[in-house]
């Protein structure tokens, strides 16, 4: 049968750490959580959009791999002719590529730009809908699924900044 019980109880307490201590604690927790994910018996890569979240993940990974004498491989994604047809909006005020280029230069990654045309994207629309079992926002899921299928040919472990926007304002 079914039963109803509480797994946990969230309580709110005042944050008493100083700003400096908070910054250091968050830095430690983020770095530690990323470094734990790159312990792997197969090569690891990252998705790099140039935003805050993927830049943090890629930067930490690149530094850790450099300590091991390895170079991080990063991937970014764009749509064919995006530089021609791009229109700024609230969701994406600028193109990603200039920020990707800055991060690649900063962390020294081996970077690959992957491009998707609209027919490839259309091929993944139904699969992405079926995977989520519901419609989602624009082409985000279908494009991610398409690009993951390309990266999966070389890498089995990929770290991303997905879902960190809400935490870091990316």
Residue ranges of predicted features:
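Non-catalytic substrate-recognition/targeting regions of SAM-dependent transferases
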Residues: 1-9
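ATP-dependent adenylate-handling active sites, centered on carboxylate activation for C-N bond formation
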Residues: 9-170
